[in-house]
Amino acid sequence: MTDPITPPITPNDGWRVRILDLSEGAEDGIVEDVKGFVNLDHANLFARRYVRDSIERCRAAGMPAGDVLAAWHAYGEDAEVLEAGPAGWRSGDDAQPFAEVRAPVEERDWRAIDPRLVSFGEDEPEEPA
């Protein structure tokens, strides 16, 4: 039996977040797997912000939460942290509250922490003297 407090072991290829197309546009619904996260918390935050932004992009002015959620399920994108077990973020518990309350910009900004777009200092050249 595993200790529920012990975090999952980092997969050999690092943490990955799977982006899923909720419409019928992608084979098996998979858009891509994003890799390069510093740790599990980074992957979880990216997945959460990505879904938060996707739900907001499906929202029209004055739209009730149920309609926002229906639009997201029809046209949006989901994200899940792979191989993280219960420690990995999934949209299940958060989608409804996200649909109920419009998100502040900082809760949607997945690009600021996207490992494909941001260097986290490991390979950056030194500052010129």
Where are these regions (language model features)?
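Short aromatic-glycine-(Arg/Gly/Cys) micro-motifs in beta-strand/loop hairpins
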Residues: 2-33
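A short, exposed loop/beta-hairpin motif centered on an aromatic-Gly-Thr core
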Residues: 28-45
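Mature extracytoplasmic domains of secretory-pathway proteins
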Residues: 44-52
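Short, mixed-charge low-complexity intrinsically disordered segments
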Residues: 52-129
